[in-house]
UniProtKB/Swiss-Prot annotation:
Transmembrane segments: none annotated. Involved in protein export. Acts as a chaperone by maintaining the newly synthesized protein in an open conformation. Functions as a peptidyl-prolyl cis-trans isomerase. GO terms for cellular component: cytoplasm. This is Trigger factor. It holds the Pfam family FKBP_C. One of its GO terms (biological process) is chaperone-mediated protein folding. It catalyses: [protein]-peptidylproline (omega=180) = [protein]-peptidylproline (omega=0). It comes from Prochlorococcus marinus (strain MIT 9313). Residues 438-479 are annotated as: Disordered. Consists of 3 domains; the N-terminus binds the ribosome, the middle domain has PPIase activity, while the C-terminus has intrinsic chaperone activity on its own. The gene is tig. InterPro entries: PPIase_dom_sf (IPR046357), PPIase_FKBP_dom (IPR001179), Trig_fac (IPR005215), Trigger_fac_C (IPR008880), Trigger_fac_C_sf (IPR037041), Trigger_fac_ribosome-bd_bac (IPR008881), Trigger_fac_ribosome-bd_sf (IPR036611), Trigger_fact/SurA_dom_sf (IPR027304). Residues 468-479 have a biased composition (Basic and acidic residues). Its EC number is 5.2.1.8.
Length: 479
């Protein structure tokens, strides 16, 4: 063994933390110290001496031995770490940390003596699955509901309706009321922040306002003033109002009703790009059927992924958890910005800390799902052929032909991840048992989303949409 060779001992710690103990020979320490002295003599400017010509004794006196030792130790630790990474094939997720800190190590560092130091870093964990086949899952079944076609058509009719003033009758469900109002809390009589308006349109439909508000307007005549008792829900957006009772003094200033367009071909042309009402209905039916298939497949895949994750054994590194938390907070900020909110003023340090704390469970769950897929691909040797990836990249590139700033490498990686995730979930579906369940909530179907390919049904399958966000974890990650 060379006199300058490093002796390395690695110890696995919790949270995928790796401790690396390194014994550095005295010869290596001395050589590094001498190199530091040489570098400092070349770069230090001292009065009366040319640059690079400062005598060693003068340099030690002017700079001081501690600074020189610190400079030598910094370069030594950096060089040792780079050599250890290559020697031990370690791929760190973050910068290393010195156990005990730099100052403590500096106190013990003597250039003429051997040095033992310990560096710690996070590394990518090796996920393992207790089982991959025969998993049991339960998923909510989603089926096409023909009545949703009529609901969507009625929504379009409302959007295209003509508002006609009403003067001869009281306010009724379905009307548009123009009101002024002011509200106070019942418990202390204080004014409700944002709880007043000189003129606001209120759609008199259930669920449009807090409980009691719309109900209180029903039956009022133009010019009437009425005090209405309301109750803020426990999950209301403003925390200080949650669960509190309130009173609103409401004045009915105007009342309008909707005059709906006739259900004919003219309506179809006005509300869509279809020429006839029959074409419109057929198009909506097709979109709703595709949406039901997409959501049903998403539910099955999400249930399967949940079942697979229950079989996972993995120690999540804090570096990846914090990175995923930041991603979630950034997504939240982006959503607020898209809604026109001032993110800079909203996202105070206190709010960011709160969001990061509350996002941790979701971040950990996302990572666990990603590692579960990674472990499945490794366990069952499931891969995507390069030809499949290339074909899909071409297809996506054509769809994005008008987009700018598309990174080909990132696009290819994203396509590869998506294809592999689909293949893994399809494999799971073929090798698992999924029990279907029908919930009453299925009656509340959302509007159709973008088209997606149909899914096969072999097994029988709970939850919605999480499976679309997880992809196999990358094999390698570096800081």
């Amino acid at each position: 063994m060379s006199a300058t060779a490093l002796q390395v001992k690695t110890t696995q710690k919790p949270n995928s933390r790796l401790a690396v103990e390194v014994a550095v020979p005295a010869e290596r320490c001395q050589a590094n110290y001498e190199a530091a002295v040489t570098r400092l003599s070349r770069t230090t400017n001292l009065p009366g001496f040319r640059k690079g010509k400062v005598p060693r004794a003068v340099l030690l006196q002017q700079i001081g031995p501690v600074r020189i030792r610190a400079t030598a130790l910094e370069s030594l630790v950096d060089a040792v770490w780079r050599e250890v990474l290559e020697q031990e094939s370690i791929e760190p997720l973050c910068e290393p940390e010195l156990s005990g800190g730099f100052d403590a190590l500096l106190e013990s560092f003597q250039p003429s003596e051997a040095l033992t130091l310990t560096l710690e870093t996070d590394v990518t964990p090796t996920p393992k699955l207790k089982a991959t086949k025969g998993l049991q899952a339960e998923a909510e079944v989603v089926t096409f509901d023909p009545s949703k076609v009529d609901e969507l058509i009625e929504q379009s009719r409302k959007q295209l309706a003509t508002l006609v003033p009403v003067e001869s009758r009281p306010a009724a469900i379905g009307d548009i009321a123009v009101v002024s109002f002011s509200g106070t809390y019942d418990d202390d009589g204080s004014a409700i922040e944002g709880g007043s308006s000189d003129s606001m349109d209120v759609d008199l439909e259930d669920g449009q306002m807090i409980p009691g508000f719309v109900e209180g307007i029903i039956g009022m005549n133009l010019g009437d003033e009425k005090t209405v008792d309301c109750h803020f829900p426990d999950d209301y957006s403003k925390e200080d109002a949650r669960g509190r009772k309130a009173s609103f003094v409401i004045n009915l200033k105007e009342l309008k009703t909707r005059e709906l367009p006739d259900l004919d071909d003219a309506f179809a042309q006005q509300s869509s790009d279809k020429a006839t009402l029959e074409e419109l209905r057929n198009d909506l039916e097709q979109r709703l059927q595709e949406d039901a298939k997409r959501r049903d497949r998403s539910n099955r895949h999400d249930a399967l992924l949940e079942a697979l994750t229950e079989q996972l054994e993995v120690d999540l590194p804090n570096t990846l958890v914090q990175q995923e938390i930041r991603n979630l907070v950034e997504q939240t900020a982006s959503q607020f910005a898209q809604q026109g909110m001032d993110v800079k003023s909203m996202f105070t340090p206190e709010l960011v800390r709160s969001l990061m704390e509350s996002s941790r469970p979701e971040a950990e769950e996302r990572l666990r799902r990603s590692f579960a897929l990674t472990a499945l691909a490794e366990s069952e040797d499931l891969k995507i052929e390069e030809s499949e990836i290339s074909a899909k990249v071409k297809e996506v590139s054509r769809e994005l032909s008008g987009e700018r700033d598309i990174d080909p490498a990132r696009l290819r990686q994203a396509v590869s991840d998506d294809l592999l995730k689909d293949k893994l979930l399809d494999w799971l579906e073929d090798n698992s048992t999924i029990t279907e369940k029908v919930l009453e909530s299925e009656a509340k179907t959302s509007k159709p989303a973008a088209k997606s390919k149909g899914s096969k049904t072999k097994s029988t399958k709970t939850k919605t949409n999480k499976a679309n966000t997880e992809k196999p974890a990358s094999d390698k990650s570096k800081s």
